[in-house]
């Protein structure tokens, strides 16, 4: 990548994307505790979308690819076609690490090191609606709630 771009545009990107990436880190930690928070899912989606847009404007293709993959995962999450799982969080955190590493490359005016292709592939897979097999696996992993009984039934026991 040539850094002969307008330095003002690059500086604007570095400031805005830097703030968004810091916020994304905090939001992902919060998501682990609140995986069904629609506002949070939308905010994370917008964060990756905004960084992707700025990176695209600057022709930072490798950064665009990683952000686009994460953005697609959050698009499917916010439409309810997939649920947040431990595996999904691991992949998203790895993707954010790759995005942060590329962001550091941009800050240092160095060529970008693309994300591991396995991360991009995992993002692509996780951006598809949850399969019936995955749904069955999640259902089996969740314990059945204990039945509630009335006081009359309890007294009868």
For the regions a protein language model found, what residue spans apply to each?
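Non-catalytic helical tethers at domain boundaries
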Residues: 1-157
């Amino acid at each position: 990548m040539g850094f002969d771009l307008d330095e003002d545009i690059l500086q604007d990107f570095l400031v805005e994307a830097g703030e968004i990436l810091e916020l994304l880190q905090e939001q992902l930690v919060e998501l682990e505790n609140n995986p069904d928070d629609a506002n949070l899912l939308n905010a994370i989606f917008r964060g990756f979308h905004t960084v992707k847009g700025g990176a695209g404007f600057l022709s930072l293709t490798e950064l665009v690819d990683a952000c686009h993959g994460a953005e697609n995962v959050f698009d499917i999450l916010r439409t309810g076609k997939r649920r947040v799982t431990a595996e999904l969080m691991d992949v998203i955190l790895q993707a954010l690490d790759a995005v942060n590493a590329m962001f550091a490359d941009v800050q240092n005016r160095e060529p970008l090191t693309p994300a591991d292709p396995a991360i991009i592939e995992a993002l692509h897979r996780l951006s598809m609606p949850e399969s019936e097999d995955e749904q069955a696996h999640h259902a089996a992993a969740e314990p059945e709630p204990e039945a509630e009984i009335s006081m009359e039934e309890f007294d009868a026991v």
